[in-house]
A protein has these predicted regions:
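Amphipathic alpha-helical hairpins
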Residues: 1-133
Length: 133
C-alpha cells in the first residue's frame, strides 16, 4: 500500500479539485524534510555554536509534520486554510535552508538538510500553484 493509493481511496472535499499528484509530491517532500531536519537538529545540538541551527531545524521539522498531516486529511481540506499553511512551510523551509547552507561546507548533515529544505519549499510552491482561487 502506498500513500498515493490511500489518498485516492479517501473521500475528498475541496481536495477533489486539487492536484493529487502535487499533493502527494508535497507530502513526500515534507516527510523527507522532517526526517532530515530532525537528524540535523540532533547532530547540531551537541556542537558548540550550533544552537541556532539545531533550533531552526527542529522548528522546520515541526512545521513539515503539521503540513504533511494536514494534507493527509483530504476530506477536511480547505484551500483557504491550506494556502497560509503552505506559505508558512515555504518560509520556514527557506529560513532553515539558509541557516544550514551557511555551514554546508563544514557539515555534510547541514548540506543534506539544506537540500531537503529546498526540495520541500519547491514542492510546497508547486502545491500552492495548484490551489483553486
Amino acid at each position: 500500500m502506498s500513500t498515493d493509493e490511500m489518498m485516492k481511496a479517501m473521500p475528498m472535499a475541496d481536495a477533489a479539485t486539487m492536484d493529487t499528484t502535487a499533493m502527494q509530491a508535497c507530502i513526500d517532500a515534507c516527510s523527507a524534510c522532517l526526517q532530515a531536519c530532525t537528524m540535523c537538529s540532533a547532530a547540531m545540538s551537541s556542537m558548540d555554536g550550533m544552537g541556532r541551527c539545531a533550533s531552526m531545524c527542529a522548528t522546520c521539522a515541526d512545521v513539515c509534520l503539521a503540513m504533511m498531516r494536514m494534507m493527509m486529511r483530504p476530506a477536511s481540506m480547505d484551500a483557504a486554510v491550506l494556502r497560509p499553511m503552505l506559505e508558512a512551510c515555504i518560509a520556514v523551509c527557506r529560513a532553515c535552508m539558509a541557516e544550514c547552507s551557511s555551514h554546508a561546507e563544514m557539515s555534510e548533515t547541514c548540506r543534506l538538510c539544506a537540500m531537503a529544505c529546498e526540495d520541500c519549499a519547491s514542492a510546497c510552491e508547486a502545491m500552492l500553484a495548484t490551489l483553486p482561487a
